[in-house]
Regions:
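Glycine- and acidic
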Residues: 17-22, 154-156, 307-316, 365-369, ...
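Short beta-strand segments
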Residues: 49, 140-142, 188, 226-227, ...
Length: 507
């Protein structure tokens, strides 16, 4: 028997084909994948989503802010497309347990996630056996990266625990092989490959966040692995395991063709280049329209110019005024802090001279709050040294460290700090690149004390900023950053940006 598995991952609420920053049509969104799904689907086809549905798009943000008692648009979309199975992703925990519970209840598909527990009970099934007929069946195992506690707000996961994904899959595969009569095993993993697909060399710090390579290389019995989380796009074989990771925002559909008699498998990715499914678009149309009207709501204006990001690399080498402005807002709310730290996210567009909600949600794309941490000069230098890893030197010029864009872009892990002056020498060895660090005209000493405000993600150690995880929390500002930006702009309708050219990056 020949079966087919269709897979999406990291859809992040992108149902419609429009860019929320400028309303332009794009090759993305479930409504562009719908035609592929309809064409390929038959009685021997499974449709699976691999998590990160509830956070991301402006439609999701609007829904979670104003209409959370209604059915989530992504639940409507998954039900319309008749998904068979789905998995939880790390970002699905961003809005707390009530939102997840409602989503689980609203989605008709079977939840696979077995290694995420709530009150000691698995949130999904241990594993699923899908029978195609009396003689053919496959097992499906769903797991999510266990690193969620590193990033997530404690109150959102206070009743949750997360088992090591590799250990869970290994144990479950062994159980299935010993007790079930199936023709194959498919792992649905909201995590990615930690080794280069071609060289098998580490492509990132081996923290356990991503374990797909380890699963493929060390667990005997996996036939298919659907990966996610990394926002990468590939369809390959790893140690004989057919593995696919479709690109985020429903830009790809993963397709696995599988002969259960011979175990021959093929993998490919299809682009979101089909005609828009108008019926699906109409299904979410009223809420989409309300979200668009909200996005165009004017908030204030800049006194001079704009804060648009035209060259994101240069905006990091020479700190963009947009970063100065966001740090200005953070210091406004964290009134006990002298320093503020902020990253320019991967696809931040910046602000027009007339600022709307569309500018805010297209620029600050994550659901972060703020924390102000007390630290000494030693920890501050360690923090800056970590950010300085973003750069390298080549032929006497400042370039980017390859690990921040290959195999996946991670520009969001370069932080820029306002409130002091410092110099990064990118040709120096990692850990010795901060060659000057001055606060109010004096060199910073290891014993000096500071309070620095940063995102909740970073304060929890996200991006391997482990040096701040144990710092005293002076202020915990439970206000979403988009809300904080909007509140500040409404209170200062004609904005003056206090830009400081305080960071030098040299080769």
């Amino acid at each position: 028997m020949k079966i087919r598995i269709l897979a999406t991952t990291d859809v992040h609420g992108y149902i419609s084909p429009y860019s929320y920053s400028d309303r332009k049509l794009c090759k993305q969104g479930l409504c562009r994948l719908s035609a592929h799904i309809s064409r390929l689907r038959d009685e021997h086809t499974l449709l699976i989503d691999n998590g990160d549905s509830l956070q991301g798009s402006s439609l999701n943000y609007y829904h979670n802010l104003y209409e959370k008692d209604l059915i989530q648009p992504m639940a409507k979309a998954l039900n319309y497309l008749n998904y068979d199975y789905w998995n939880l992703g790390n970002h699905d925990f961003n809005y707390g347990p009530d939102m997840i519970h409602q989503y689980i209840n609203d989605v008709n598909a079977t939840l696979l996630t077995g290694n995420a527990y709530e009150h000691g009970q698995p949130m999904g099934c241990e594993y699923a056996i899908h029978h195609f007929d009396d003689n053919y069946a496959i097992a499906l195992i769903g797991v999510v990266t266990q690193h969620i506690p590193v990033w997530e707000k404690a109150e959102h996961i206070q009743n949750n625990t997360f088992e090591d994904a590799f250990d869970y899959v290994k144990r479950t595969v062994e159980k299935i092989k010993a007790t079930e009569n199936v023709q194959g095993i498919c792992v649905v993993y909201h995590g990615g490959h930690e080794l280069h697909l071609e060289t098998n060399e580490p492509s990132e710090l081996l923290t356990g966040e991503n374990l797909a390579s380890k699963m493929c290389n060390e667990i005997e019995g996996i036939d298919v692995l659907i990966a996610g989380h990394q926002h990468r796009s590939y369809a390959v074989f790893v140690n004989g395991v057919a593995t696919v990771q479709p690109y985020e925002n429903a830009k790809n559909l993963g397709v696995i063709e599988w002969d259960l008699d011979t175990n021959e498998r093929t993998v490919e990715l299809l682009m979101a280049d089909q005609e828009v499914d108008e019926e699906l678009l109409n299904l979410i149309g009223p809420e989409e329209q309300r979200a668009q009207q909200w996005l165009d709501k004017p908030l204030g204006r800049l006194k001079e110019g704009n804060l648009l990001v035209h060259d994101p690399i240069d905006a990091r080498i020479h700190k963009h005024p947009l970063i100065s402005f966001i740090n200005q807002v953070q210091l406004y709310f964290a009134d006990k802090a002298q320093l503020s730290s902020q990253a320019l996210f991967n696809e931040s567009v910046g602000f027009n001279s007339e600022i709307t909600m569309r500018d805010l949600v297209s620029t600050y794309v994550y659901s972060n709050t703020l924390k102000a941490l007390r630290m000494n000069g030693k920890v501050l230098k360690e923090y800056l040294e970590k950010t300085a890893e973003y750069f390298d030197a080549e032929d006497g010029k400042v370039v980017l460290n390859r690990v921040f864009y290959d195999p996946k872009p991670m520009h969001f892990n370069y932080e820029m700090v306002d409130g002091l002056d410092y110099t990064i020498k990118s040709s120096n060895p990692i850990g010795s690149r901060i060659v000057e660090m001055v606060y109010q005209g004096k060199p910073v000493e290891e014993t000096d004390e500071f309070v620095m405000v940063m995102s909740s993600y970073r304060a929890n150690g996200g991006g391997e900023f482990d040096m701040v995880k144990n710092c005293e929390v002076v202020q915990d500002i439970q206000k979403d950053m988009v809300d904080a930006l909007a509140e500040y702009i409404l209170a200062h309708p004609v904005l003056e940006v206090e830009h400081q050219d305080n960071i030098k990056v040299i080769a």
